[in-house]
Amino acid sequence: MFLNPKAEEVAKLLRAARTIAIVGLSPDRTRPSHGVAKALQRFGYRIIPVNPFAESILGEPAVPSLDQLPEVLASDERVDVVDVFRRREHIAGIVEACIRLQLPALWLQEGVVDESAAARAVQAGIFTVMDRCLFRERAALRD
């Protein structure tokens, strides 16, 4: 059974992170992913939209998949967290991409649950949070 990391570990991740790739980020302002991404920008994070149907979202160039992340990263920049707004059936493939790209942290947004994919990510050494809202967790931190 998958267990989320302890609150202090999550807080440490969110304080250290600088760049967040958001898989499934919508250009539609009414979608939850858009609101979360905008709030994350206000918190000072650089966001990278991962959406095959968008050129840019919230002023940032979009990439069609996680495999294209290197195309938009500076030479000294890395993705610290992959935040996912996709349905369960897409999660296993996203986890495999995170493993292949050696991305350090995976965040499955509230309502996104895939126990076996989350366990696979943890087994591969990826810090994994599931079924929690990254925005709410970050907003609750005292800087």
Residue ranges and their predicted role:
Residues 26-31, 38-58:
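NAD(P)-binding Rossmann-fold cofactor-contacting core
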Residues 48-51, 106-110:
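Short internal beta-strands
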Residues 110-138:
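Rossmann-fold NAD(P)-binding glycine/threonine-rich loop
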Residues 90-106:
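Rossmann-fold NAD(P) dinucleotide-binding segment
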Residues 20-21:
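Conserved beta-strand elements of the Class I
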Residues 82-83, 107:
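N-terminal Rossmann-like NAD(P) cofactor-binding module of classical short-chain dehydrogenase/reductase
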